[in-house]
């Protein structure tokens, strides 16, 4: 691990991810709560989440581009562009022009850019790390991308409570600027990319969709299809729950602590993924029983609106399994997919797994408005329980071996 940290490119990517995540925590909490505060409706919260989560579908179409652009240049420019974009919110606020629709437009744009940034960073790992270092590298990047939110979300809630929403947006802009400067120190070799040989627009479009098809081909195997099918509805449910969290929480501190609980669960899951004993457990059992635990934890969570401590623990417990699965899913794709197609594959995997999330946001907003946030969380959790039942009845999932036997499964798939 020390050797990896001394790798300049990996260190820059890791540190850049951490700095950006701090700013993102401030922005995500501030903008989500501001939308709910200005509108007073979970319909608007759900609609905003619908718009931001819809960018994952756009990522599915744009993912082949990741293999054909100057990734270093893209990472740098994307950070500076977001730094400017985020300042529009406090600027409009200063002149009394800010309304909920401005935030609902800016949030999806930033979300779309970030949907491409993280897969882009992940696609660079095979170019700077050996195959033996990939699992550890992915684990560290996952911790930086998701696990660090446990700390940053807590700080964000405190900062917003003490300093206000606009301070959060200024701090976020500064974090983007710092990360953009940091990415300037990436090696020049990471600027190289596949140059298009085709000259005509028709061939460029044809080539783009061929690359997209190559990324989607990964999911033709019936075992992977059953797994991804379940994940689609898990994301649908999780997003419906996220849409009503501002109403469920009632204040900045509780909301930020719930997001921190989610981050802590993902962090512990990422760390736990490397434990030898866990690698010996059948993935089928891990997925089925894991989702049952998630569903039951969140059903209980829906009844603890007035108990912050218990609520945060139960909500965080539900995200623990996700942290475990993320590490192995990314590593699997990186090993079986050629380096020149890794960007397409990573983008396709994330895009497909979040396909139903936007509709989940709309459903959550509707249920929260016309019933209650607690009932919306209960319904979302019950859908996850149904996914666990579906996997238990699916022999392709039940027969998945342990992680230690995963290479044999990949050989059969290929």
Enumerate the predicted regions with their spans:
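Juxtamembrane intracellular "pre-TM" segments in multi-pass secondary transporters
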Residues: 1-10, 189-228, 410-414
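Residue-level recognition of membrane-helix boundary sites in multi-pass small-molecule transporters
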Residues: 12, 43-47, 73, 102, ...
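Short amphipathic helix-loop junctions that connect adjacent transmembrane helices
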Residues: 29-42, 243-254
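Short helix-capping/hinge motifs at transmembrane helix termini and TM-loop junctions
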Residues: 40, 52, 63, 93-97, ...
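C-terminal transmembrane bundle of multi-pass solute transporters/carriers
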Residues: 68, 72-74, 78, 83, ...
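Hydrophobic alpha-helical transmembrane segments
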Residues: 100-111, 136-194, 256, 260-264, ...
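A single, central transmembrane helix in multi-pass transporters
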Residues: 163-170, 211-271
């Amino acid at each position: 691990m020390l050797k990896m940290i001394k790798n300049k490119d990996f260190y820059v990517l890791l540190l850049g991810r951490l700095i950006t995540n701090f700013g993102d925590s401030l922005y995500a909490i501030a903008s989500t709560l501001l939308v709910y505060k200005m509108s007073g409706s979970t319909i608007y919260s759900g609609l905003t989440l619908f718009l931001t989560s819809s960018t994952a579908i756009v990522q599915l179409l744009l993912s082949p581009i990741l293999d054909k652009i100057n990734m270093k240049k893209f990472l740098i420019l994307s950070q500076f562009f977001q730094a400017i974009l985020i300042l529009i919110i406090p600027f409009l606020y200063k002149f009394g022009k800010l309304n909920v629709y401005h935030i609902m437009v800016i949030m999806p744009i930033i979300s779309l850019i970030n949907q491409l940034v993280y897969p882009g960073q992940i696609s660079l790992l095979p170019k700077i790390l050996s195959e033996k270092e990939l699992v550890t590298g992915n684990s560290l990047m996952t911790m930086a991308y998701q696990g660090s939110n446990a700390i940053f979300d807590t700080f964000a809630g405190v900062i917003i409570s003490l300093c206000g929403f606009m301070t959060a947006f200024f701090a976020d802009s500064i974090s983007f600027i710092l990360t953009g400067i940091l990415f300037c120190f990436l090696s020049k070799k990471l600027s190289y990319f596949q140059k298009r040989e085709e000259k005509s627009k028709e061939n460029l479009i044809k080539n783009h969709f061929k690359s997209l098809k190559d990324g989607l081909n990964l999911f033709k195997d019936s075992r992977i299809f059953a797994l991804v099918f379940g994940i689609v509805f898990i994301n649908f449910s999780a997003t419906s729950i996220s849409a009503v969290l501002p109403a469920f929480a009632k204040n900045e501190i509780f909301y930020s602590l719930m997001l921190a609980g989610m981050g802590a669960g993902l962090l512990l899951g990422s760390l736990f993924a490397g434990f030898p004993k866990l690698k010996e457990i059948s993935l089928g059992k891990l997925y089925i029983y894991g989702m049952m635990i998630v569903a039951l934890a969140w059903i209980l969570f829906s009844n603890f609106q007035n108990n912050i401590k218990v609520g945060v623990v139960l909500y965080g417990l539900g995200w623990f399994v996700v942290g475990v699965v993320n590490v192995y899913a990314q590593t699997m794709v990186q090993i079986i997919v050629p380096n020149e197609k890794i960007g397409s594959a990573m983008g396709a995997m994330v895009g497909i797994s979040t396909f139903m999330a936007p509709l989940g946001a709309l459903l959550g907003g509707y249920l929260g408005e016309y019933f209650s946030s607690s009932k919306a969380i209960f319904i979302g959790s019950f859908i996850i329980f149904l996914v666990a039942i579906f996997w238990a009845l699916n022999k392709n999932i039940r027969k998945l071996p342990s992680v230690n036997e995963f290479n044999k499964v990949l050989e059969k798939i290929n």
